[in-house]
Regions:
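Acyl-group handoff/entry surfaces in thioester-processing enzymes
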Residues: 1-73, 88-177
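Short, charged/polar, Gly/Pro-enriched secondary-structure boundary elements
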Residues: 74-82
Length: 179
């Protein structure tokens, strides 16, 4: 178990101040206008949860002062959901729905704080939606994680170079806490 870093505390304080985890959600749609092998994409998302330790962080129940601890689970065996939004007529209509998903909260203790959903979108776009608690990752890290996931996909689909190993989350966390 580890305490929160300074950056995580900032987001946690917002959650406490506003009484909702909604103020600490971050969501991204990553899609391409091309056919995707959703079986392979699912495999790559599952691999990404192994490679990106932040996706496996859980938070304990708050203590009497509202503070939480964080810990890393070794595996996340959850299935990856799939939504076919291609019949919605336009990307704008699909975006409206996904904007609603972005406001959903992760309520509870010792629960996953990251969720991937594979998507079939209007106008021939396909990809995934990722929704996370911002205490797990910053915006730059989210871009790196999405890039890594697509590199895994292109490695298995097209034989491109295998992506470099990512920084180990627990090692980086310990360094941040030592500052």
């Amino acid at each position: 178990y580890y305490p929160l870093t300074a950056a995580q505390k900032m987001h946690h304080n917002w959650i406490m101040d506003y009484g909702t985890q909604q103020v600490s959600g971050v969501s991204v749609v990553a899609s391409v206008q091309a056919e995707l092998d959703f079986g392979l994409l699912k495999k790559c998302i599952q691999m990404e949860t192994e490679r990106s330790g932040c996706t496996r962080i859980r938070f304990t129940k708050p203590d009497k002062d509202g503070n939480v601890q964080q810990y890393l689970v070794k595996q996340d065996p959850r299935d990856i959901g799939f939504k076919d939004l291609s019949g919605m007529g336009s990307l704008a209509k699909a975006d409206e729905l996904m904007q609603q998903w972005a406001y959903e909260t992760f309520d509870g203790d010792d629960i996953p704080m990251c969720e991937f959903t594979m998507l079939k979108l209007p106008e021939g776009y396909n990809g995934f939606f990722v929704h996370m608690d911002h205490r797990l990752i910053d915006s730059c890290g989210l871009v790196v994680m999405i890039g890594d996931l697509f590199q895994l996909y292109t490695y298995y689909k097209y034989g491109t170079a295998y992506p470099q190993e990512l920084a180990d989350f627990e090692t980086v966390l310990k360094k941040d806490l030592a500052k």
